[in-house]
From Swiss-Prot:
CDD domains: SIS_PGI_1, SIS_PGI_2. InterPro entries: G6P_Isomerase, G6P_Isomerase_C, Phosphoglucose_isomerase_CS, SIS_dom_sf, SIS_PGI_1, SIS_PGI_2. Transmembrane segments: none annotated. It comes from Ralstonia nicotianae (strain ATCC BAA-1114 / GMI1000). It comes from the Bacteria. This is Glucose-6-phosphate isomerase. The gene is pgi. The keyword Isomerase applies. The lineage of its organism: Bacteria, Pseudomonadati, Pseudomonadota, Betaproteobacteria, Burkholderiales. Its EC number is 5.3.1.9. Signal peptide: none annotated.
């Protein structure tokens, strides 16, 4: 139990000792610049400034002691060796191998995995080149102009986020679209205006049984046929990303057009695998492999950097600090970079599906809060929506600001205004605004002054990239993955299963049968039974 560790007990006492200290005092001290220097880390093209946190050098030392006592780096090494650290599913956790090079010695169950990884990567590269060159055509001999990725969860969020983030690097030959929701509106609106003769579908499902994905895949199959694509030629319009060859063949997809991956790849960590085929088609193999290299650089940093200089380790420990010792139930991710607007959606799955657990690896209760709610939007939009709560609300919400020093699209004056707002929000959260400062600004109405006071002392990190390119994005995502791992390792939970999503899927099956007219096969609670009756009556 993490709360029984000596470092946890020391941190609990330390948190009480510094709770009343305002960060303004630390930044007013003569050694403020030294604080910034000490609490800044660089890795793989990213710069992390974590000086605006409610920590001292002693805090950092205790957090690193906690990591040591919890065996975080020992578990890290076990993961990278291919040991089965996903103990509930008896699987290795080797997403780092997906961005590896031939000389990297990643192993699962003792067997080298890089030959298979490189084989599938080459298959993806070859396929993308065939599509981009027009060698791969639809049934009528026309080149592919549009690609629709059908998937959900890890088969959608990561690739969708990357394709949006790197849209400025997109190849001109194809447009990539994403469909995830079983609500038919999602697919219908995506297909509206597309030409079936020049459209390719990627059906992305590890098991090829995912309800939402297969419903959309079958509907798209009907769309092709209804628009004149001969059934025998559907193979020119479908490829699969899956591990279930029999189901792929039964659907009608040529097994030669199946891209596989492995059970040591978790869905939310899979965009680097064949699940990223849509990314390769969107930005080209060269940019995709540059993204892999950026992630690999972060992997190497995480594996070898000293603890005090280890960016993912520090970020993960800060998350534990606020969740466990300040009661921060949520954490906000705000990229001041419009192309990263889907990053928070990706981060929600990455962190909340990984660490939304209440039992330890051995099944015992954890004894502390875990898995904060992750939320946010792109800046500056968030400033005009929810920043009021972050600044003056009754709870602490740690914020991660993410931005680039160079603009993605250059319009005169825009990027400097963006950066000014990003930096100002972090400063405002730190400093706050005292009653004296409010009055000094000319506010004479005594009743109004309390409403204009900002407590400040609200923590934030700032992550800087020189520019948003494939390498920096790869490093940013890999950093987030490893940060998530660190949190789970401290809490002693398995961050690589997701049993919490299974029960709802199981219960949906008999309800679906009832909605389609079958008699009830299971007993429901009164509320659910009433909802089913209403839905059936409305049909």
């Amino acid at each position: 139990m993490p709360t029984a560790l000596p470092a946890w007990q020391s941190l609990s006492q330390h948190a009480q000792a510094i709770r009343a200290t305002h960060m303004r005092d630390w930044f007013a001290a003569p050694d403020a610049e030294q604080r910034v220097h000490a609490f800044t880390v660089e890795a793989a093209g990213l710069t992390l400034d974590y000086a605006k946190n409610r920590i001292t050098p002693e805090t950092l030392a205790l957090l690193l002691q906690l990591a040591d006592e919890a065996g975080v780096l020992t578990l890290r090494d076990a993961m990278l060796r291919g040991e089965r650290i996903n103990n509930t599913e008896h699987r290795s956790v080797l997403h780092a191998a997906l961005r590896g090079h031939a000389e990297d010695d990643y192993r699962a169950n003792g067997a080298a995995v890089m030959p298979d990884v490189l084989r599938v990567r080459a298959q993806m590269r070859d396929f993308a080149q065939r599509v981009h060159s027009g060698t791969w055509t639809g049934h009528a001999g026309q080149r592919i102009t549009d690609v629709v990725n059908i998937g959900i969860g890890g088969s959608d969020l990561g690739p969708r986020m990357v394709c949006r983030a790197l849209a400025h690097l997109a190849v001109p030959q194809v447009r990539v679209h994403f469909v995830s929701n079983v609500d038919g509106t999602d697919l219908a609106e995506t297909l509206a205006g597309l030409n079936p003769d020049t459209t390719l579908a990627i059906v992305c499902s590890k098991t090829f049984t995912t309800l939402e994905t297969m419903a959309n895949a079958h509907s798209m199959r009907r769309w092709f046929i209804e628009h004149g694509v001969p059934e025998a030629q559907l193979k020119q319009h479908f490829v699969a990303v899956s591990t279930n060859r029999d189901a792929v063949v039964a659907f009608g997809i040529d097994p030669d057009n199946m891209f596989t991956f492995w059970d040591w790849v978790g869905g939310r960590f899979s965009l680097w695998s064949a699940v990223g085929l849509s990314i390769v088609l969107a930005i080209g193999p060269e940019q995709f492999e540059t993204m892999l290299d950026g992630a690999r650089a972060m992997d190497r940093h995480f594996a070898s950097a000293a603890p005090r200089e280890n960016m993912p380790l520090i970020l993960g420990l800060l998350s534990v600090w606020y969740r466990g010792f300040f009661g921060a139930a949520s954490a906000c991710t705000v990229p001041y970079c419009a192309p990263l607007e889907l990053l928070t959606d990706f981060m929600q799955q990455l962190e909340m599906e990984s660490n939304g657990k209440s039992v330890q690896r051995n099944g015992a209760a954890i004894g502390t809060d875990t898995g904060p709610i992750v939320w946010g939007t792109a800046g500056t939009n968030g400033q005009h929506a929810y920043f009021q709560l972050i600044h003056q609300g009754s709870q602490i919400v740690p914020v991660d600001f993410i931005t680039t020093l160079e603009p993605v699209r250059s319009l005169p004056g825009h990027h400097t205004k963006l950066l000014a707002n990003c930096f100002a929000q972090g400063e405002a959260l730190l400093r706050g605004r005292t009653a004296e400062e409010v009055r000094a600004d000319g506010i004479t109405d005594a009743a109004l002054v309390p409403h204009m006071v900002f407590e400040g002392n609200r923590p934030s990190n700032t992550i800087l990239m020189q520019r948003l390119d494939a390498a920096s994005l790869g490093a940013l995502i890999a950093c987030a993955e490893h940060r998530t791992f660190v949190q789970g390792a401290v809490w002693n939970i398995n961050s690589f299963d997701q049993w919490g999503v299974e029960l709802g899927k199981k219960l949906a099956k008999p309800i679906l049968e009832e909605l389609e007219g079958a008699p009830a096969s299971v007993a429901h609670d009164a509320s659910t039974a009433a909802l089913i009756r209403r839905a059936k009556a409305a049909r």
